[in-house]
A protein has these predicted regions:
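Short sequence/structural segments immediately N-terminal
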Residues: 13-135
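Sec-dependent N-terminal signal peptides
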Residues: 2-13
C-alpha cells in the first residue's frame, strides 16, 4: 500500500519529493517502517519499495500520487541513516508516523536541533563528521 504510493510518485517524476501520503490510513495494518523504507537501517538514505510489493494489495490502483519535498539538508551537510540508527529510533526524528496524515519532520533539521541531539546521545560534535570542510 505505502509502497505503491511511493513508487507511483517516483514513476510520476517525483524523484526529488516525497509522496503526499497518509501513514495514519495504513496504521491499523501495523506495517514496520523497514517494510517500506528498505535499507534505512543500513544505508545512507532510506529506500523506496518496488511497485510489485505494493500491488499485492493495490492490484487495480493507477492513481498518480502528488509529491512534495519534505526533508532537505544543505549541500554541504552529510546525513546518514545508518550512522544514526545505532542510538536513534526512527520516531526520534520522524515522530509517530502512524498518527500523521501528512509526512512531516518531528525534529527540525537545523544545526541547533542536531547539536542538542548529539549532546543528549553523547555523539560526536566534530564539525567535519557532518559538514564538508570549507563550506
Amino acid at each position: 500500500m505505502l509502497r505503491l504510493a511511493l513508487v507511483l510518485a517516483v514513476a510520476a517524476g517525483a524523484l526529488c519529493g516525497e509522496p503526499v501520503f497518509s501513514h495514519k490510513t495504513h496504521a491499523p495494518l501495523k506495517i514496520a517502517c523497514a517494510n517500506c523504507h528498505a535499507g534505512a537501517e543500513v544505508k545512507e538514505r532510506a529506500g523506496f519499495p518496488a511497485a510489485a510489493q505494493c500491488q499485492g494489495c493495490h492490484k487495480d490502483w493507477s492513481a498518480k500520487i502528488p509529491s512534495q519535498r519534505v526533508y532537505k539538508v544543505r549541500d554541504f551537510v552529510f546525513f546518514s541513516h545508518v550512522a544514526h540508527k545505532a542510538k536513534t529510533a526512527c520516531a526520534d526524528c520522524h515522530g509517530d508516523m502512524w498518527q500523521q496524515a501528512t509526512v512531516s519532520l518531528f525534529r527540525p533539521v537545523t544545526m541547533i536541533a542536531c547539536v542538542e541531539c548529539h549532546k543528549e546521545k553523547k555523539a560526536t560534535e566534530v564539525c567535519n563528521s557532518c559538514h564538508e570542510l570549507g563550506q
